Amino acid sequence: QRFASAFMTLVPQTPTKRVTVAELTRYLHVDRKTFYNYFDNIDSLMIWIYRAYLAKMLEDALFDDWEKEKLSADAFDPYPELPFYARRREKGLLCQGPYFKAMAYHWENHRRYYSIVFSSSCYLDLFDYIIALFLPPFREDVRYYLDGRQMPDIVVDFIAEYHVMGVFGRLRYHFTQTNKFIMQDEIDSFWNYAHTAMKESVECCFEAVERRGIARLLGQGGQTVRFRGYHRERFSECGDGRLS
């Protein structure tokens, strides 16, 4: 925790360059070996900061009755043992608002740190890591709303990607592009919006798949044709001076 606190202090002090292991250990008056006893590198420290907060957050009594999720032991992740996601199921709905609100408080309480690491090329692309982390549970959320109905994996992926980007894309936007306080009272009832909308997306896409089939849904069977520009002859003049 000392490494995490020191790193989050140093990053805003040096916003245009990467804080190194040497600088971090010098700040704490410890040798580099001590750092490497805990972390492989600065990137793994950044991941731990975020994951450790989520794990600690989920220990709160608010989440006692929630279904916690960890990564599988064979996942390509430095901290698979730390829970990072939780679900509350209620009458066929996923009520995720309190989870996302509690998570956003961590970002808000460390706004300067996250505004830098989300926008700087000096560090691990933490946003990409977060998207990759949450896509699998969001896919499971889509399947929960399907309730046993069959849907092609490519459509499940589309819905999960759309909504995970909606949640975390909005958060990153606020922390890199605006100075707005994200916990406004006016939107307090909308923290579950992504999963409310996800249910509607599942119903809409399932209806389309069922009615027309996946080939029709994606635009007639066969491979997707990439746009290669308009052919010149389509715009040649007709005999009467009009464009064809």
Walk through the language-model features, giving the residues of each.
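Secondary-structure edge/capping motif, primarily at the C-terminal ends of alpha-helices
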Residues: 68, 111-117, 145-148, 174-178
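Alpha-helical residues within the helix-turn-helix
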Residues: 26
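A short secondary-structure junction motif
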Residues: 10, 56-60, 64, 110, ...
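An amphipathic alpha-helix adjacent to DNA-recognition modules
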Residues: 1-8, 12, 17-21, 29, ...
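Short, residue-level hotspots on alpha-helical faces of the histone-fold
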Residues: 5, 48, 52, 128, ...
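C-terminal peripheral helix-coil segments that are non-catalytic and often amphipathic
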Residues: 139, 143, 164-244
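Amphipathic alpha-helical linker/stalk segments
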Residues: 13, 50-95, 114-116
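Amphipathic alpha-helical packing segments from all-alpha helical-bundle domains
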Residues: 98-109, 121-147, 157-168
